[in-house]
């Protein structure tokens, strides 16, 4: 007899199970998309940007944060629910859950953050977000491929020749290394966190142009499976999603927490105007019930209920479970995001 490592066995199990992400991407690529094929990712990679704040604050306390142990448990519970298609994590978290076999018999795909640019460094007392984003990568792709075959790469454009050339060279180097290690990735493109000299009305289209331009020189094998971008309103979303449908697949990021209505209205509008993926971090993490939130996100996307009704159902659930809501119903029904307000009038 010979000995087979646990890592080999887990990898073998993963290969036997069709991940929901792959099924849905195939539907989108072949123009067979239905709202049930909308992809949702839970982004729990926050410690790569916010450090010890990542697990979120303890309920009822202003300065105390949950433990990393609680953060891992939240990941396990979301994977077990099978409501998401992707769990995005730090490499360290992914390694722990991989060795537990968390994804071995699950339709949920494990993904890791493969770079940690300075614009996500939200450390207490820091001022990193006062400067243009600089490329930086902690993760070793050679190590990553042992635990996950999908990752996120992030880039932010600054309208500055030297800084953008540096960022694009980093992307090019990354693409070459991804190919060498037989990994796949999706591309995150943030809105710049500082004034870059682009008119606010033109900024969404500047970002669209940057995305298309930076990928035009890449062969299909080197391009991302999908994008993760900020929802900048219906016009920009329609333009980007209609540019190369089925090949340039657009996803949205969640940005800040906002109200519960913001969360449901965001997935509703984004899907309506062409997005096929939602990758939410704080909009899931900082809720009273993350699993119920994702369940209702799916119902909204599938047009079973509207965003207003979803908030009302959510508050009824909290009341029945005797969970104290962070906002009362009237406040939580408010749409606070300006892009979403504009989308209502579009």
Indicate where each model-derived feature is located.
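C-terminal helical cap(s) of enzyme catalytic domains, especially alpha/beta-barrels
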Residues: 271, 286-325
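Alpha/beta enzyme core
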Residues: 66-82, 101-105, 129-150, 159-184, ...
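Active-site-proximal loop/turn and secondary-structure-junction residues that shape catalytic pockets
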Residues: 44-46, 90-95, 114-118, 157-159, ...
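Glycine-rich phosphate-binding active-site loops on the catalytic face of alpha/beta enzymes
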Residues: 255-257, 273-290
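Hydrophobic residues within beta-strands of alpha/beta enzymes
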Residues: 87, 153, 227, 278-279
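Alpha/beta catalytic barrel-like cores
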Residues: 17-159, 307, 315-323, 342-346
């Amino acid at each position: 007899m010979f000995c087979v490592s646990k890592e080999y066995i887990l990898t073998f199990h993963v290969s036997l199970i069709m991940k929901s992400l792959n099924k849905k991407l195939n539907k989108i690529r072949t123009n067979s998309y239905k709202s049930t094929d909308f992809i949702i990712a839970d982004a729990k990679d926050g410690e790569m940007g916010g450090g010890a704040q990542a697990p979120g604050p303890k309920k009822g306390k202003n300065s105390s944060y949950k433990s990393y142990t609680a953060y891992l448990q939240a990941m396990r519970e979301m994977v077990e629910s099978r409501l998401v298609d992707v769990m995005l994590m730090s490499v360290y978290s992914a390694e722990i859950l991989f060795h537990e076999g968390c994804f071995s018999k699950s339709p949920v795909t494990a993904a890791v953050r493969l770079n940690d640019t300075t614009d996500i460094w939200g450390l207490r007392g820091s001022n990193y977000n006062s400067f243009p984003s600089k490329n930086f990568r902690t993760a070793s792709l050679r190590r990553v491929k042992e635990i996950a075959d999908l990752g996120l790469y992030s880039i932010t454009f600054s309208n500055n020749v030297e800084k953008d050339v540096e960022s694009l060279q980093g992307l090019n180097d990354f693409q070459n290394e991804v190919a060498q290690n037989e990994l796949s990735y999706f591309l995150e493109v943030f809105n710049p966190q500082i004034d870059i000299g682009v008119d606010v009305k033109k900024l969404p289209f500047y970002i669209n142009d940057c995305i298309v331009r930076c990928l035009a020189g890449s062969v299909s094998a080197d391009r991302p499976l999908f994008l993760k971008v900020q929802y900048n309103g219906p016009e920009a979303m329609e333009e980007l999603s209609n540019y190369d449908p089925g090949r340039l697949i657009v996803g949205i990021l969640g940005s800040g927490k906002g109200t519960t209505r913001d969360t449901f209205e965001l997935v509703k509008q984004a899907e309506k105007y062409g997005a096929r993926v939602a990758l939410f971090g704080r909009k899931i993490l900082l809720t009273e019930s993350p699993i119920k939130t994702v369940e209702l996100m799916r119902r909204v996307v599938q047009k079973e209920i509207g965003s207003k009704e979803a908030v009302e159902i959510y508050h009824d659930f909290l009341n029945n479970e005797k969970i104290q809501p962070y906002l009362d119903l009237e406040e939580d029904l408010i749409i606070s995001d300006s892009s979403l307000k504009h989308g209502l009038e579009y």
